Amino acid sequence: MRGELNIPALSRFGKSISASLHHQNGSSRDDNDSNPYENRSSNSGLNRRNSVFGLPSSGLSSRLSKPSLSSINNSNNSSSNTGGNVLPNPALTPVRNMSNKPPLTWSPSSANLFGTSKVTSIIGNNVSDVVPPVIKKALASSHGGGMSLSIVLLEPVLYLAGFDLNECQIENPALLRGALVLRVAKPANIRGISLSFTGRSRTEWPEGIPVKGHDTYEDKVIISHNWKFYEPTMKDADAPQHGADVARLVGEQLPLPSSAAASLRGYSVFAPGEYTYNFDLAIPNCFPESVEAKMGWVRYFLEATVERFGTFKSNLNGRTPVQLVRTPSPASLSSSELINISRDWDERLHYELQVSGKSFRLGEVVPITFRFLLLDKVRLYKLSISVVESSEYWCRSRKFHRVDPKRRVLLAERSAKHQNTDNLFETPDEGDGLSSAVFNFNVALPTCLVKERDRLTFDTTYKYIKVRHRLKALLVLSIENTENPEKRKYFEINIETPVRILSCRCVKDSTLLPPYESSSQGDNQVLLPCPCRLATTHVEPTEVTAFTTQSVLASSAPSAGRPAAAQISRPAQLFRIPSTNPPPFDGDVCPPACNTPPPNYDELFDVLSSISIQDCETDRANDDTILNNRVRRSGTIREEAPHRSLSRTVSRSFEIPR
């Protein structure tokens, strides 16, 4: 038993060495007996540290402790007395001999790791000064606060372009980009880090599937994609960054075992720091958008999981939603093409309805114009504008179908105070064909913050949930009753046209390119709150994300740089194609005067004609010279025919003997 060392790796109290070692190292025994509790605590603490890191006790303690000169001499003397076969036991080094500046992995201040502690190392694929944004609230954290998990999205809202299949195939797909941020305050044993992107849909069927069936809903998985960021079996599993794209490590780092040891143990030790794992995924435009209907929904979310090693260590799970918004294709004219309806009613009234577009977002103001031309004695008592919403649901591969009752939301209404005497036309009902009336409305669509009975759902493209809208105008008219002049005949005219309602997040600054004259790039920021909420509440600076890409605040508030004349709303009948940012009326600037007048074509024609005549004379002289040379060479002289420049006789070739 000479030199035998017995240090249990997981012992609660250290029985440090055997009796034979005490006999051979008397000096060390005397020092140890002077303070047995100190030795016992140091041995047990180091042994537990060895069991965590999977290292021999001698190698680890020599790196963590700084023994004094007397202890080194005593160890050398003991080794020389035993013939050099017994190595000194560094685990017996007292705690008082350790350096005054221990590593941060042992420091209690590491619990406040991301408060005032200093980052001493940054490890990444590309070393740069880019630091991940500060996360306001973690999605998941451990019980003691030693580990937290967060998901940062570069674009919190993704826009899918196109409502038709052809438009979806032409446009580029949306790109989901972000980072998973893992913060570790003290060394932790981790078995795996993964992230999944999932899209699910559900339709509610209270009457059962089929009718009086047991199933009252149907769930479907639209997409499921997984990322494996870290596994113990991966290459370089025990590297300092553990597969992270950017790793910000805190304190002095200890050398860790090889990847083979991590694969055998089934976990790796993550040093204190912040680990960032980037991810991206292309989402085709043919995918359904996020929907929250009355009897169904479509939702997308990212779910991160951190598997921890240990008996009483629970896994960290965090989930964050991802919104997919459907927008018209940039090549589509639905937002700029006008709706014009022109009809005649019983040869008594000619009316026109004009709407400045075919697609509008929730909360947007829609200009609507009515024009009337009186052909007879007609009175108008009521004029109302509303939106009618129809919803349809399918399930079991579209075998079962349900149509919900239509919902009508009133937008604007104008009526006469006294139905018998008043008239909205405000003109005597002469019916001479010359009197007319025009009504302009600025109708505001309801936002997503209104009451449930007045709330609208935007149009959907999902094949199991269909929501459509129609704009409806109601006219209440009256004419004279020839049979009873004291009473009038009343009629109702319904005007309907399909319109497309978009999500409230389809603001111009998010779906269109920014103006070229904007020089400041830092002002365009993505705001997580809904634009409907921005119009009613004040947005705090903390709600603005750290990534600057787009803006929705500019669409909800008038621009301060534009003149007051540009902010005045124009009637819809004054322009054919409405602009998203029209200039003021006096904003047109005349082009500069042209300082180069056109040339004098008479002189130019004379010069060109003289040049053409000289060219003809030169060509004729050249032909005569060639002909004389050929005649002299043959030896025969023939009488040449006179030149006829304007004759149409058939030319004959000269007979030259050969």
UniProtKB/Swiss-Prot annotation:
InterPro entries: Arrestin-like_C, Arrestin-like_N, Arrestin_C-like, Arrestin_domain-protein, Ig_E-set. This is Putative arrestin-related trafficking adapter C2D10.04. The keyword Hydrolase does not apply. Belongs to the ALY1 family. The keyword Phosphoprotein applies. The modification Phosphoserine is found at S653. Residues 21-107, 638-658 are annotated as: Disordered. One of its GO terms (biological process) is ubiquitin-dependent endocytosis. Residues 96-107 have a biased composition (Polar residues). GO terms for molecular function: calcium ion binding; protein-macromolecule adaptor activity; ubiquitin protein ligase binding. Keywords: Cytoplasm, Phosphoprotein. GO terms for cellular component: cell division site; cell tip; cytoplasm; cytosol. SMART domains: Arrestin_C. May regulate endocytosis in response to extracellular stimuli. It is found in: Cytoplasm. Residues 39-81 have a biased composition (Low complexity).
